[in-house]
């Protein structure tokens, strides 16, 4: 495989996807009340946000905080509060699939990743949501194919990998701390597993393996959207922190600013 370049620092272990918008936090829970204060662009962008509702919230983030446990009390939103008021049924993506061999948790974990145009953060999928997503992609469960414990581990790996991806992005964004002191937020993301980046193809021509996945993350840098490309490479066994992949994270060549960032970091690496 070979070493991969990641942020202005070094390549870091991590992997795949995230989730997004919430409803209200569990009653009495002190979390999610902090706001990103001191950002000079908050007031400046509020008009634009109200005018265009620029960043549409994904459906899987709707009422997401109904399923997030309070880190202080361990309390979760009451079951009744987690039901669709129109039919008193849980949201479809939290409903067990027909012939599902075992029950799966519907609890969701709040990420550390700020959501654009919101004081809230992205919320990761539950075990049940992940299972249903795999079914929608054509996967079918077979005897002893995946266990209840496996699904728990899959979610832990998924969440940890996204946290590491965001840390890598923050290292790049540190180059722009002067223009965006409040830090970036995540607008949207998407998987492009078979759309190999030019960098990944060049590595392949040199004899290294292709990444097993690719994501593009669009972040909001205080009013400016910036695209990051993330290539995921197999890093061996899963460690105790649920990391097993090596990430190659970098801003896409979409602007002169991104090209300049890449050139600066390449020079630093070459001369360090």
Curated annotation (Swiss-Prot):
Membrane topology, as annotated: Lipid-anchor
Region (Disordered): 1-62, 76-116
Enzyme class: lyase
Record bears the keyword Lyase: yes
Pfam families: Cyto_heme_lyase
Domain of life where this protein originates: Eukaryota
Ranges annotated as biased composition (Basic and acidic residues): 50-62, 107-116
Main localization of the protein described in the UniProt heading: mitochondrion
Record's subcellular location: Mitochondrion inner membrane; Membrane
Catalytic activity annotation: holo-[cytochrome c] = apo-[cytochrome c] + heme b
Annotated protein name in UniProt: Holocytochrome c-type synthase
Species the sequence originates in: Mus musculus (Mouse)
Recorded name of the encoding gene: Hccs
